[in-house]
Amino acid sequence: MGAKSMEGMNLKQTAIADFHHVSVLPTALVEGLEPKPGGYYLDATVGAGGHSERLLKLGIPLALTMIDRDVQAIAAAMERLQPLVADRKDISINTWQGNFADFPGQLEQFDGIIADLGVSSPQLDQGDRGFSFRHTAPLDMRMDQSQDLTAAEIINHWSEKDLARIFYEYGEERLSRRIARQIVEQRPFQTTTDLAEAITKWVPGKYRHGRIHPATRTFQGLRIAVNDELGSLEKFIAQAPHWLKSGGKFGIISFHSLEDRIVKHRFRETENLRVLTKKPIIAGEEEQRQNPRARSAKLRWAEKI
């Protein structure tokens, strides 16, 4: 399935022991997909395989292609799903490692497409990936470890103007100019904790004991820039409807207002899509209690016409 297909790769060689992720809105996503026997479905952000697992547990014959930028995510998903498909000749699974915006989809290929955006819990929790300031790690933040651009490259080499722009536009950080100016004056920075501690010192005292850590928005902006998350989402939504058969469902879970705004407006503006959710579907109180990540999740659906 292309240069980045995982077929034939020994996934056992990939470290997956720590890649555990609880999927959000699993019931709403699978039910909204309306799977049918013999259907062909695309999980565009497989993560650890939670949503695909729900789909396979329906027990119907189907074909499934799973995408993720992170090779560890695909390995974890395959290990998780193997018991469900080991004796099923009527189920076909393909994997493709890379950015969903670059997937070589074909015209009217799928009966349904789902995507769960953003960074996964294992990526946040694995200290060496550099996504979180809870762990001391190199400033990395790459979802795809084969790409060249890292958070360290951005922090230590981009201009003050560009740093302020990504912190403001992608992180919605009101102190973006102040933080960018201090970074340029005091760089280089090598680790997540060095940067986070410095940001904490630079912001006014009233921001140091708020609901979120003073570095949270800066780190979000940095991560989105490293992985071109919003640009990739725009490209994906522009292409994916062409891969859907007529009547096929397209569901996307977003986790912050920037993503949700793109999904909402692109679904509405795309001529061959009909919006099925005037308001986004959100997690119930019980799911939010069990999985705090679900609190910010919003699911929107569209249908190919």
Curated annotation (Swiss-Prot):
Cited Pfam families: Methyltransf_5 (PF01795)
Gene3D superfamilies in the record: Putative methyltransferase TM0872, insert domain, Vaccinia Virus protein VP39
One annotated GO biological process: rRNA base methylation
Location(s) in or outside the cell: Cytoplasm
Catalytic activity: cytidine(1402) in 16S rRNA + S-adenosyl-L-methionine = N(4)-methylcytidine(1402) in 16S rRNA + S-adenosyl-L-homocysteine + H(+)
Annotated Gene Ontology cellular component terms: cytoplasm
GO MF annotation: an example: rRNA (cytosine-N4-)-methyltransferase activity
Keyword Secreted (UniProt): no
EC number(s) stated in the UniProt entry for this protein: 2.1.1.199
Residue sites binding S-adenosyl-L-methionine per the record: 49-51, 68, 100, 116, 123
Keywords: Cytoplasm, Methyltransferase, rRNA processing, S-adenosyl-L-methionine, Transferase
NCBIfam families per record: 16S rRNA (cytosine(1402)-N(4))-methyltransferase RsmH (TIGR00006)
Function text: Specifically methylates the N4 position of cytidine in position 1402 (C1402) of 16S rRNA.
Family statement: Belongs to the methyltransferase superfamily. RsmH family.
PANTHER family: 12S RRNA N4-METHYLCYTIDINE METHYLTRANSFERASE, S-ADENOSYL-METHYLTRANSFERASE MRAW
Protein name in UniProt: Ribosomal RNA small subunit methyltransferase H
The organism's taxonomic lineage, starting at the top: Bacteria, Bacillati, Cyanobacteriota, Cyanophyceae, Synechococcales
